[in-house]
Amino acid sequence: MTIALSEQLTNRFFRYLAVSSQSDAASPTLPSTEGQHKMAQMLAEELRQLGLEDILIDEHATVTARKPGNQPTAPRIGFITHIDTVDVGLSPDIHPQRLRFTGSDLCLNAEQGIYLRTAEHPEILRYQGEEIIFSDGTSVLGADNKAAVTVVMTLLENLTADDCHGDIVVAFVPDEEIGLRGAKALDLARFDVDFAYTIDCCELGEVVYENFNAASAEIDIIGVTAHPMSAKNVLINPIRVAYDIISEFSPQETPEHTEGREGYVWFTDMTANPNSAKLKIAIRDFDNVSFAARKAYIGEVVAKVSAQYPRAKISYSVTDVYSNISNSIGEDKRAIDLIFSSMAELNIEPKVIPMRGGTDGAALSTQGLLTPNYFTGAHNFHSPFEFLPISSFVKSYQLTRTICLSAAKA
């Protein structure tokens, strides 16, 4: 008996979630965690069983493979998904569950008293009566991005010789959540396609071909230590210097006070002791001019505060992380056009959004490979209340399949 598509997707998704593959920003290695090696090995073995060609798993836990097409004139389409889940201080182990939403608050974990409150997450109200996948509230769900891994692998399993399509090339990469490290290291000679897609984040219908420009900055401060009994006119407290630096930035241009296409500067980490302090900063903006100005302002603030504390030593660095996909859109817009035509065929209403984040596609688009993004169907990423309506999960799969088949007809 043929298993229902919803069951096929859910069963595979749960199997992938059973492999703990949280990334670790503090690790200098690629991948940053051993669990990602395990995830990559699992996928490589499944690809072998499915009969794909050119399967390669490298030392960085990047897996690439090709499903040969039967339409030689069709474009080569790529799908890139990431195998890590995010570390936000929750458990690295994910315990998924299927619950039917009846319209009331949902108990995710009775033992720990964890509830999803509809007043706090009103977006769930549109899924009344539906089956939805949640974690048990002790971790993220990991639909970001294992729902996408599931969609792609299920497509590769289900395509038959009767389905007309071009070559489909897949890449499963590590450490997206800690700076797109895997995508940046991907050899595009291995991922040789005409255009590609990520399936990362986003509720049903959402399409992304515009995202933040992103940079990171670090400011290092060395003060002057002294015993408090003789500190007058001697001691330079690096924590106070750090406070003065932070105070130079608008409190309204932060993630919690901005939306849409508004950019921000976000102080993400601070370590300090009586001798030194370090600040870490995330810089985000859609507009290229504003983005450059925000990066330059870091240096202006350091110069200003250095003048106030001439005996302190203050240094800084700014590093670009990824750029706006829209910067890379040229005359060939087939990748984007196929999303919309395929959505129309499936009666899915598109919702184009400027993504206040980035995907592996941002790294690839910067290298000249246009890689727009569309939905998995999930909500509340990076949260214990992340959830994935199964109906939306199915639609994500159907869209992925339709894109591949429609491209061969164009």
Curated annotation (Swiss-Prot):
Cofactor remark from the record: Binds 2 Zn(2+) ions per subunit.
EC nos: 3.4.11.-
CDD domains per the UniProt record, alphabetical: M20_peptT
Active site: D84, E176
Keywords per UniProt: Hydrolase, Metal-binding, Metalloprotease, Protease, Zinc
Enzyme class: hydrolase
Residues where Zn(2+) 1 binds: H82, D144, D200
Gene Ontology molecular function, alphabetical: metallopeptidase activity; tripeptide aminopeptidase activity; zinc ion binding
Cofactor: Zn(2+)
Binding site for Zn(2+) 2: D144, E177, H382
Similarity annotation: Belongs to the peptidase M20B family.
Name of the protein this chain belongs to: Peptidase T-like protein YPO1009/y3403/YP_3421
Source organism of this protein record: Yersinia pestis
